[in-house]
Amino acid sequence: MSSIVAPERVLFAGEAGDIETLIEYPVEAPRAIAVGCHPHPLFGGSLTNKVIHTVSRAFLAAGAIAIRFNFRGVGASGGTHDHGEGETRDLLTLVAQARARWPQLPLWLGGFSFGSWVSLRAQAALEPALLVSVAPPVGRWDFSTIAPPRCPWLVIQGDRDELVDVEAVSRWLQDNATPMGPPPQLLRLADADHFFHGRLHEVKDAVTGFVIASAA
């Protein structure tokens, strides 16, 4: 399943100014709203990042309205980088407006690296139907206050990640399993680096399969 119309570029209203957003639509009636969060803005992260683009295309292939957006200070989004605080509020604001636009649809949520941290910080308030975290930067940002997700949750981690401690991710997942929801599904890709060079097809296949199984 793929988009048959050009992506829609929308400027949503945020507390720091516009939130630049790219929206793609599935061929058939949508099953969900799916929001993807990009990696660190100060290191070139934006909605065009290839990893979050891959996650977004997987959401689209599974039948969702796929939404990517630029955090504050990136592209046409207003404001300046806020070390995750303002970015989390931007995500909450964007999802509220998307839900007002498509009130009947559940939310799927995903993020890569810094974006996975932001989406994890917001998920308790957003209550998504499912969650995808790619290379969550455990040890680089504060994960201590993140509530364990209560929805189906896929974590994809390369075991040759040069930026994230792979074992720290595994320990954090073990420590944050909750009886209130299904256990996280950890997929460790052998010989994959932080940006999954040459492995993005595996990321897309994993996300698509997880979403189809979880949203059935």
Placement of each model-derived feature along the sequence:
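Gly/Ala-rich beta-loop-alpha elbow adjacent to hydrolase catalytic centers
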Residues: 110-119
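Short, surface-exposed "cap/lid" segments of acyl-processing enzymes
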Residues: 18, 27-68
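N-terminal cap/lid segment of alpha/beta-hydrolase-fold proteins
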Residues: 1-29
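Alpha/beta-hydrolase active-site loop
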Residues: 51, 81-101
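Short beta-strand/loop motif that positions the catalytic acidic residue
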Residues: 149, 153-157, 161
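Acidic catalytic loop of the alpha/beta-hydrolase fold
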Residues: 159-164, 194-195
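Catalytic histidine neighborhood in serine/cysteine hydrolases
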Residues: 174-195
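Post-His helix in hydrolase/transferase enzymes
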Residues: 197-210
